[in-house]
Amino acid sequence: FTHGGHPYTFGPRHFLTKDEKLFGFLNEYVPMRQIPEHEFLTYIERDQRFYHFPIHRDEVSEMPDAEQIESELEACPDEVSPENLEQFWVQSVGPTLYDKFINSYSKKMWQIESNTELTEFGYTAKGVALKTGPNKACWNEAISAFPVAQNGYDDYFDVSTAETTVHLSTRIEKVDVDKSRALIDGEWRDYDILINTVSPEFILNGAFGPLRWMGRDFFKIVLPVPEVFPENVYFLYYANQEPFTRIVEYKKFYRYESPMTLIGLEIPSNRNKLYPFTTKKDYAKAKLYHDALPENVFSIGRAASYRYLDVAPIIQQSMDMRAELEVGRVRPAA
């Protein structure tokens, strides 16, 4: 999308992977610019300052409660065995750092009363719980990149659909997964396979009840300066009582020339379905939906998988699907 001539996406869509082969594949079709310098900052209101995230060990000494934090870090176990997100962070960095950086932010992000509700949390630490060393970039253990072109990933969709017939502005009225067909413009159309990219509750008519989701209200704000964030900082997180969670400066990603800059401000919302709830209970309900789908129906992407996936694992899902079809592990519908 563009706003006032500024390119943006609904939420940042930087590419993250540890798989060099996967990065090479995408880079062949959509030239990518690696951004290893990518940093996050989190505003901690009680300290009246920003700190890096992941939490950096070197910045603890700059905190007003450093002595308390140091004693808590000393008491942290060498290996953690958490049952929920709160336990993960308290065991990893102690209660004070957890309360500063995670407690309010996570409750705000998911609109929950307690972080003990979140029982699946492998994505939360942005790589590590407590970062050390001179490099304060977020993703120095993975490839962090973004498309060079101003249209972002759009060219990838042209490549991936080059040998298909694409029906634009088409509404699917109903899906019959058992017969591998879809009702379009009042006519049933049969297909060998179905690839679903929306929540499985839609194509199975809510058979097992609604899945829980969190969404975002997204506000685009143009500012009359060329750049507002510090060098190498792409995101700002807010871990306090303000209603918003994150601000993104899109010029950092797109590198376009303008005397102004666009920021995107995100507020948790129930208006859309963008983030699947990361609990065993919610995953179990999603599994009921997935298990009810015939083998020729593939669930691809964050919504269909009901997993907190980004660009790289979604491309990998598509590659895995192709591999299954090529070796005949999945038979097309009769």
Name each region found by the language model.
Residues G4-D78:
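Dinucleotide-binding Rossmann-like beta1-alpha1 core, especially the glycine-rich loop
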Residues I35-H38, S169-R171, Y250, I300:
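Conserved beta-strand termini and adjacent loop/short-helix elements that scaffold enzyme active sites
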Residues I55, R246-A334:
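Conserved flavin/dinucleotide-binding core of flavoenzymes
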